[in-house]
Amino acid sequence: TDIENAEVYILGFYIDMTSAKLHEVLDMLKKGRQERSAEILRRLKALGMDIPLEYVLSLGKEGFTGRNQIFRAMVNLGFARPDKRYGDFQRYLGKKGLAYVEHRGLSPEDAVRFVRDSGGVPVLAHPGTDIPFSFIEDLIGIGLEGIEAYHPTHSKETTKKWLKFTKSRGLIVTGGSDFHNVSPEEPLGLGSLPVPDSIVLELTQRWLKISSVQSTPSC
């Protein structure tokens, strides 16, 4: 979801995939994404780019769609250049873009609570340089357990900053090479980003710790 100057993504590791609440929330998010995509497409059409919603939906998985699928459609139909990911994408679909529509999903706070309630480990994804420490401190107070310090968009300096921050706050570190980028010049995906093996062990240990606390009956 969005905050004043940045977009916030919460990852959920070890979520119970059979949870009825999970599927209820996913259905809500899917509907919200489709409504947002339809509004973005209306704005793009006003700019001379007529892109059918059905085509965009066909580029997503199981009905989920968003700006990355819209941008892929723009590229496929000749409305954007694939080598201008942060030019054309930001111009039309970025937070200050001509066709941008604010995302109305779970708030970061609700997302953290939801992941924990679903038996998972909530982690802040690729915070970059735009998310203020004070905001993250608030999420920690709610139950945030980690930060994705290793990410293709993070410079070495940014990664070091978040490694230091997580250590000082007792958080776990995670990493990901990402899978939803559509730019051919950015090699994202499995195996494209070195991440220490120890991260998996620490993540699993944190999940087991959370699970044991949640399963302990109160006196």
Residue locations for each model-derived region?
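Active-site gating loops and adjacent loop-to-helix segments of metal-dependent hydrolytic enzymes
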Residues: 1-34, 72, 76-97, 189-211
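Short, function-defining helix-loop hinge/capping sites that tune catalysis or transport
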Residues: 134, 184-186
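Conserved, well-ordered alpha-helix/loop/beta-strand core segments that scaffold catalytic motifs
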Residues: 99-142
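A metal-dependent hydrolase metal-coordination microenvironment
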Residues: 1-66, 142, 146-184, 192
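Active-site-proximal loop/helix segment associated with metal-binding centers of metalloenzymes
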Residues: 35-54, 59-106
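Active-site-proximal helix-loop elements at catalytic-domain edges
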Residues: 133-148, 206-217
